A protein has these predicted regions:
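Bacterial Sec-dependent N-terminal signal peptides
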Residues: 1-22
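N-terminal mature-domain "stem" immediately C-terminal to a signal peptide or N-terminal signal-anchor/transmembrane
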Residues: 20-100, 263
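Long, mid-chain structured domain cores
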Residues: 69-164
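Active-site scaffold of zinc-dependent metalloenzymes
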Residues: 101-112, 190-220
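Sec-exported extracytoplasmic/periplasmic mature domains
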Residues: 130, 166, 170, 231-236
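Auxiliary, metal-adjacent structural segments of Zn-dependent hydrolase domains
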Residues: 142-201
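Active-site recognition of the HExxH zinc-binding catalytic motif
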Residues: 220-244
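Post-HEXXH active-site segment of zinc metalloproteases
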Residues: 237-261
Length: 263
């Protein structure tokens, strides 16, 4: 009887821990997404957010020639800053007392960022943030963000379970802190990212785009997207190791043979 009660208690604690994961809106994710949209990055220009997309265009269109936007376009051309690299920067930013600052390990900013003067980038980003009155825009849409997050938590979060990641990839329990952020400018773009703050568990992010079908007016609630994006934080480091290249090629070829008829 005692063992049964302990088992039930453990199950309840596990469910409670999983229930603590809630979707979020992030000012830095919106900042990088809207900067990318203003710079004409096609992956952030889907405009699948209905009135929010219209509000974004009305507010930021006048800043398409802003010095930071011009500089950012150059970074894309020279360093390939796009897609998940935008998101990787976003999760390594925080806003404190009205200023954007870098946090975490700068060595985690790869994929082109390692060739960028990060202090200079943040300085330019702060100018865009101030000149566009970005915080004012973000706060004006706080109710919109929160209303959607409630819907997302109802429709998606009951299906999100993260305890298996550590067991599957490391053979141990998951110590990571999993977070789901909605990118309201991302549309059909979805990315995974991670960061390690000093003295904190590894934070694993799934940044999922707000996707409103323009034909039906229905919101997309895809329960598989966060799970897919979380995987990147575990799979990508394995792929980057040279000693794994041959093994992955062999497995990839076998998997392709099994699935090529459906592709």
């Amino acid at each position: 009887m005692k063992q049964t009660l302990l088992t039930i208690l453990f199950a309840l604690l596990t469910i409670s821990a999983m229930a603590q994961i809630k979707s979020e809106a992030s000012e830095t994710v919106e900042l990088m997404g809207i900067l990318s949209r203003t710079a004409g990055f096609q992956e952030f220009s889907n405009d699948l957010a209905g009135q929010y997309s219209k509000d974004t265009e009305a507010w930021f269109a006048q800043y398409r020639e802003h010095p930071t936007v011009t500089y950012y376009k150059e970074l894309r051309a020279k360093n390939g800053i796009a897609y998940d690299r935008v998101t990787n920067m976003a999760v390594h930013l925080e806003i404190e007392k009205g200023k954007v600052k870098l946090v975490g390990n700068r060595a985690e900013l790869t994929g082109g960022w390692q060739n960028v003067d990060l202090d200079d980038f943040v300085k330019r980003l702060n100018k865009f943030y101030a000149d566009t009155r970005f915080h004012e825009f973000f706060e004006q849409h706080r109710t919109f963000y929160n209303d959607f997050l409630k819907q997302y938590d109802t429709n998606v979060m009951p299906y999100i379970h993260t305890d298996w990641y550590g067991k599957f990839y490391n053979g141990t329990g998951s110590d990571e802190h999993f977070r789901i952020i909605i990118g309201f400018t991302y549309g059909s773009t979805n990315n995974g990212a991670s960061r390690q703050l000093p003295g904190q568990p590894l934070e694993v992010f799934a940044v999922c785009g707000y996707n409103l079908n323009p034909q039906t007016g229905r919101l997309l609630f895809d329960t598989s997207l966060p799970l897919h994006e979380f995987n990147h934080s575990f799979v990508n480091p394995l792929m980057e190791k040279a000693e794994n290249e041959k093994a992955m090629q062999e497995v990839g070829q076998r998997l392709f043979q099994l699935s090529q008829s459906a592709m």
